């Protein structure tokens, strides 16, 4: 089976493959970040979002993979074979988990649309010949903040008074009128 773990989120393995392998933080750093930012939601029995669910699954799978590789490494007599197993897990599986963890943490932090926009813009940048592209790659945290998804249930605070309110009417007078209507 050819399963793309990013498909339901609007991305693809190919889109993430444009980012160099050294772009992604270590699994340990990503796990620490996930724990610091989203521990309560990840440990909650409630469903928060598909990104939380995917992150939860990735963390559990990583733990199982480490347990398995530790067991295999401890049971291999040949040091060369042991080193090959450790190297394979760190290189191949480690990169996949680093990509997966980074994607879901970034989507929760910046919003899915912003992350997809970043991946597309980075992909365009990296495929453009060096002579024709800007010297610096796009940076996720500097993309426009208009695409960041706000939490449900909270409306942004107004910075200006409502246009319906007449400025000439004093607050005291309005209170008096409202008291009269209540009686």
Curated annotation (Swiss-Prot):
Quaternary data: Homodimerizes, then multimerizes. Interacts with cytosol exposed regions of viral L glycoprotein present in the reticulum-to-Golgi compartment. Interacts with human FLNB. Phosphorylated form interacts with host importin alpha; this interaction depends on the exposure of the NLS, which itself depends upon genome maturation and/or phosphorylation of the capsid protein. Interacts with host NUP153.
Biased composition (Basic residues): 149-176
Tree of life domain: Viruses
Region (RNA binding): 177-183
Region (3 X 8 AA repeats of S-P-R-R-R-[PR]-[ST]-Q): 155-177
Residue list for modification Phosphoserine: 155, 162, 170
Annotated GO CC locations: host cell; host cell cytoplasm; T=4 icosahedral viral capsid
Disordered: region residues: 136-183
Intervals of motif Bipartite nuclear localization signal: 158-175
Its biological purpose: Self assembles to form an icosahedral capsid. Most capsids appear to be large particles with an icosahedral symmetry of T=4 and consist of 240 copies of capsid protein, though a fraction forms smaller T=3 particles consisting of 180 capsid proteins. Entering capsids are transported along microtubules to the nucleus. Phosphorylation of the capsid is thought to induce exposure of nuclear localization signal in the C-terminal portion of the capsid protein that allows binding to the nuclear pore complex via the importin (karyopherin-) alpha and beta.
GO biological process: microtubule-dependent intracellular transport of viral material towards nucleus; symbiont entry into host cell; viral penetration into host nucleus
InterPro entries referenced in this protein's UniProt entry, alphabetically: Hepatitis_core (IPR002006), Viral_capsid_core_dom_sf_HBV (IPR036459)
Sequence repeats: 155-161, 162-169, 170-177
One Pfam family named in its UniProt record: Hepatitis_core
Compartments it resides in: Virion; Host cytoplasm
Keywords, sorted A to Z: Capsid protein, Cytoplasmic inwards viral transport, DNA-binding, Host cytoplasm, Host-virus interaction, Microtubular inwards viral transport, Phosphoprotein, Repeat, RNA-binding, T=4 icosahedral capsid protein, Viral penetration into host nucleus, Virion, Virus entry into host cell
Family statement: Belongs to the orthohepadnavirus core antigen family.
Gene Ontology MF term list: DNA binding; RNA binding; structural molecule activity
Protein name: Capsid protein
């Amino acid at each position: 089976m050819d399963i793309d773990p990013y498909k339901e989120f609007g991305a693809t393995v190919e889109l993430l493959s444009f980012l160099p392998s050294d772009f992604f933080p270590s699994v340990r750093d990503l796990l620490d970040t996930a724990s610091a930012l989203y521990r309560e939601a990840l440990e909650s029995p409630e469903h928060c979002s598909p990104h939380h669910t995917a992150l939860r699954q990735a963390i559990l799978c990583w733990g199982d993979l480490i347990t398995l590789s530790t067991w295999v490494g401890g049971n291999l007599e040949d040091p060369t074979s042991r080193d090959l197993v450790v190297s394979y897990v760190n290189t191949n599986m480690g990169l996949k988990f680093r990509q997966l963890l980074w994607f879901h943490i970034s989507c929760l932090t910046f919003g899915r649309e912003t992350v997809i926009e970043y991946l597309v813009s980075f992909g365009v940048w990296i495929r453009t010949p060096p002579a024709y592209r800007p010297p610096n790659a796009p940076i996720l945290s500097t993309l426009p903040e208009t695409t960041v998804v706000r939490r449900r249930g909270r409306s942004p605070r107004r910075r200006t008074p409502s246009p319906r309110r007449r400025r000439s009417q004093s607050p005291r007078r309005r209170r008096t009128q409202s008291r009269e209507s209540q009686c």
